[in-house]
Amino acid sequence: MKPKNFPLARYVLGAMLAFLFVGVAQAQTETTSIAEVTYAINNLFLLAAAVLVLFMQAGFAMLEAGLSSHKNTVNVLFKNTFDVCVGVLLYFLFGYSLMYGENPVLGGFFGWGGFGITNNLDNVEGLSPQVDWLFQAAFAATAATIVSGAVMGRMYFKAYLIYSAVITGLVYPISGHWKWGGGWLDKLGFHDFAGSLLVHSVGGFAALAAVVVMGPRIGRFEGNKINSLGYQGITSSSLGVFILWVGWYGFNPGSQLAFVGALNTNTTMLIAVNTTLSAAAGGLAALAFDWITENKRKPNLLVTLNGILGGLVGITAGCDTVSNWSAIAIGVVAGILSVLGTKLLDRLRIDDGVGAWPVHGLCGIWGGIAVGIFSTNVEHKLSAQIVGSLVIPFWAFITMFFLFYVMDLWGILRVKPSQEKVGLDIVEHGQTEKGVEIAFED
């Protein structure tokens, strides 16, 4: 007996198999599309953050130019410009590799992965190595430019060129490797989310080393009297601080390194709010503390501006892991420290032109320690935070002190008194801020 034919059944079975294959192919396509969109959004997020951090250079330039005298404006702006140019190139050549190289050198003192952006670097999964480098290079330039305002009116431009190259190409990447490159501080459990210590205290203590070696500007201290020496534009400085504040939304939220997904999105928003609260609290705390403790002192705008910056620096280490209320407390302490640090420098007759050490150095240390006090993550131990908060500033100060001391011995660090009185715009660059070119011979 011949088997019966079931043409309808065959058609139905064929249709079901075809539908199944189409469904699988469509699911694979949708999965691929979701992955590609996630990749694109996260990389675009980090690119935008990198641009904001790079734009902070404009904030530093405006802040420092406003606090300088008319005769040193071009010099201050030139140094900020140079920091970006030399910073990105040296960080590309070998700084990035020293910081994130997968091959440990000298027992993990720093890493190495070859020159430029190579495949031997500890790149973040899901990010283009190119945009990861761009974000990190903007950080490196930030660490370098902190010193610019502190040394205003005193340092030879050639000495600043040497300093900027050394801190960007060597000092910052090496200490950065200890934490962000997976080095010994990372293994210890030290937490510095966006660089209270790795960026700001490095720059702040480099500034302290510079001003200690060079000494104060002519006329800054006369007996018990402290002279301001004048500044040209409080408007410029105020604008600079607000540019820095806006740039910090690339600095801190950008350090999450991803935006897609509920966890990444919520953490990014927490970081942004904590950054805002700490900055505001720092400004008000500095204003109130200075106003109350200084007899007959009127409310001081510059003190408030530095308090805002202190609050921003202080929250940078733990902005991802503390509550909103803790962020306010961190900002309050940072604002007070910015005032106390300035008073301490004045008492010691140390001339920091913009308060770089109180704001970035001292508040950077506080930011690291604050993680151990306020973090909601039980793995963030106070002991590890204290170690990192002492070692990183010590590294920056010792290396930079040695560099500045050697340059001072060579006679290439501080300008002559006659040159300082004329101003570095004319002495070093032969032009004024108005664009007038003037020859100078000493």
Swiss-Prot record:
Pfam families: Ammonium_transp (PF00909). InterPro entries: Ammonium/urea_transptr, Ammonium_transpt, Ammonium_transpt_CS, NH4_transpt_AmtB-like_dom, RhesusRHD. The chain crosses the membrane at residues 5-25, 44-64, 81-101, 104-124, 133-153, 155-175, 193-213, 240-260, 269-289, 299-319, 325-345, 354-374, 386-406. It comes from the Bacteria. The keyword Transmembrane applies. One of its GO terms (cellular component) is plasma membrane. It is a multi-pass membrane protein. Belongs to the ammonia transporter channel (TC 1.A.11.2) family. PANTHER family: AMMONIUM TRANSPORTER, AMMONIUM TRANSPORTER SLL1017-RELATED. This is Putative ammonium transporter sll1017.
